[in-house]
């Protein structure tokens, strides 16, 4: 249940309009939240290679979404990256 509450708060923080649940901004924010949870999990469970592979897949998906957003709307890309604390190439 707590994951759904976390997910809904992330969606509410990053949505572009009232019924927005799938824009690139929201998807990137949700992936970043899940990535951060997996990083914390892997700090405790260093030998969990299945979760590590899942983490790498999520990072790749987020990277592709960020590349799409940077091509489509660079201002939104920079705003989302800054808001989430992501490092971007200069």
Swiss-Prot record:
Matching SUPFAM superfamilies: S15/NS1 RNA-binding domain (SSF47060)
Signal peptide as annotated in the record: none
Function: One of the primary rRNA binding proteins, it binds directly to 16S rRNA where it helps nucleate assembly of the platform of the 30S subunit by binding and bridging several RNA helices of the 16S rRNA. Forms an intersubunit bridge (bridge B4) with the 23S rRNA of the 50S subunit in the ribosome.
SMART domains: Ribosomal_S15
GO cellular component: cytosolic small ribosomal subunit
Chain ranges passing through the membrane: none
UniProt record, GO biological process: translation
Protein name: Small ribosomal subunit protein uS15
Gene3D superfamilies recorded: 6.10.250.3130, S15/NS1, RNA-binding
Gene: rpsO
NCBIfam families linked to this entry: S15_bact
Keywords, in A-Z order: Ribonucleoprotein, Ribosomal protein, RNA-binding, rRNA-binding
InterPro entries: Ribosomal_uS15 (IPR000589), Ribosomal_uS15_bac-type (IPR005290), uS15_NS1_RNA-bd_sf (IPR009068)
Record-level Gene Ontology MF annotations: rRNA binding; structural constituent of ribosome
Assembly with partners or alone: Part of the 30S ribosomal subunit. Forms a bridge to the 50S subunit in the 70S ribosome, contacting the 23S rRNA.
Family per record: Belongs to the universal ribosomal protein uS15 family.
Natural source organism: Herpetosiphon aurantiacus (strain ATCC 23779 / DSM 785 / 114-95)
């Amino acid at each position: 249940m707590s994951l759904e509450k976390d997910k809904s708060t992330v969606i509410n923080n990053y949505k572009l309009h009232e019924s927005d649940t799938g824009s690139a901004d929201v998807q990137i924010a949700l992936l970043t939240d899940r990535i951060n949870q997996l990083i914390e999990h892997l700090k405790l469970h260093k030998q969990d290679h299945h979760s590590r592979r899942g983490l790498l897949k999520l990072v790749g998906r987020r990277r592709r979404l960020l590349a799409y957003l940077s091509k489509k709307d660079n201002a939104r890309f920079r705003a989302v990256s800054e808001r989430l604390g992501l490092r971007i190439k200069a």
